[in-house]
Swiss-Prot record:
Organism: Arabidopsis thaliana
Assembly notes: Interacts with HAM1 and HAM2. Interacts (via MRG domain) with CO. Component of the NuA4 histone acetyltransferase complex.
PROSITE patterns: MRG (PS51640)
UniProt-recorded name of the protein: Protein MRG1
UniProt GO molecular function: methylated histone binding; promoter-specific chromatin binding
Region (Disordered) residue spans: 1-28, 93-147
Positions of disulphide bridges: none
Reported function: Chromatin remodeling factor. Acts as a 'reader' protein by binding to H3K36me3 and H3K36me3 to control histone H4 acetylation. Increases the transcriptional levels of the flowering time genes FLC and FT. Binds the chromatin at the FT promoter upon interaction with CO.
Pfam family, one: MRG
Biased composition regions of type Polar residues, renumbered to the chain: 12-24, 106-115
């Protein structure tokens, strides 16, 4: 997914430019400037790499510190904050509100939180701190040398045809003003079940590790979708479609599942596991992507997209 194929996914909340003062030509931020950037409902450390005037509005190409470059994107000034102590406090408050501040969750929190460091130094320090903690735990169990982080090992190769799908997905939503019709069929749960059936027929059985990885994909998808897998104009549709205890994996399909795979290396960046475990997981994820590619004509269809119409009791509402 190229840098040009990214829609602005700003939060609908408070998105002021954080006390920025315009330059003589109206720019609020400059190339090379370290900033804080909204992505979904949270704020992340970022760096402005390019600045361009587009349709009488300044746009800023940002790189989220510690994230894969596939998530670099063009944003408006209302997505950015100056890197100040005041705004760092705001960042921490938003993180706490979303339940991702360190120590607010036990057990699974290390596997589900995303990187939210304000700058490169903090990013590196956090990584070192977590790695040190992981090594300490492994040392106590006698397996320190086998302990590695996903950041070093997790490399998911997305097939070319699926990369094109990700680009097409962006174009449908950002340029053609469409959204994926919900509920999708097959949905994520059904796709995972179909893969399980496929593996059973192919190999005669499915190992416990494969089954656990598939359960993990479902869990990550349900947690990640509302905070990092939706474009801005998809949010009202999400609010209308996911009610009560409905799981996103029973409503959304392969289009949104592919977005998760782009994000997985970052989601796994704090997880410490034995190298053999990571290797097995990477192999399963790659095989699963090949399965989606093989069934692309069934799972991923242009007809799955429809115009984003104003809610009239029949269609989904447009997030203006």
């Amino acid at each position: 997914m190229g840098s040009s194929s990214k829609e602005e996914t700003a939060s609908d909340g408070d998105t002021a430019s954080g006390g920025a003062s315009p330059s003589n030509d109206g720019r609020l931020f400059s190339e090379g400037e370290r900033v804080l950037a909204y992505h979904g409902p949270r704020v992340y450390g970022a760096k402005v790499q390019k600045v361009e005037l587009r349709k009488k509005e300044w746009k800023y190409f940002v790189h989220y510190l510690g994230w894969n470059k596939n998530w670099d994107e063009w944003v408006s000034a209302d997505r950015l904050l100056k890197h100040t102590e005041e705004n760092l406090v705001k960042q921490k408050a938003l993180d706490k509100k979303q339940g991702v501040e360190k120590g607010t969750k036990s057990g699974r929190s290390a596997q589900t939180k995303t990187r939210s460091s304000a700058d490169t130094k903090a990013d590196k320090d956090d990584t070192k701190t977590n790695a040190a903690k992981g090594k300490k735990r492994k040392h106590e169990s006698g397996n320190e040398k086998d302990n590695v982080t996903a950041e070093k090992l997790m490399k998911i190769q997305i097939p070319a045809s699926l990369k094109k799908q990700l680009t097409d997905d962006w174009e449908y939503i950002a340029q053609k003003d469409k959204v994926v019709k919900l509920p999708r069929s097959p949905n994520v749960d059904e796709i995972l079940s179909k893969y399980l059936e496929f593996k059973t027929k192919k190999d005669g059985m499915v190992t416990d590790s494969v089954a656990e990885i598939l359960k993990g994909i479902r869990s990550y998808f349900d947690k990640a979708l509302p905070v990092m897998l939706l474009y801005k104009k998809e949010r009202r549709q999400y609010q209308e479609s996911i009610v009560d205890d409905t799981s996103p994996s029973t409503v959304y399909g392969a289009e949104h599942l592919l977005r998760l795979f782009v994000k997985l290396p970052d989601l796994f960046s704090y997880v410490n596991m034995e190298e053999e475990t990571w290797s097995r997981m990477q192999q399963t994820l790659s095989d699963f992507l090949k399965f989606i590619q093989k069934n692309q004509s069934t799972f991923l269809l242009p007809s799955a997209y429809d115009s984003d119409k104003v809610s009239d009791g029949k269609g989904k509402g447009k997030d203006d």
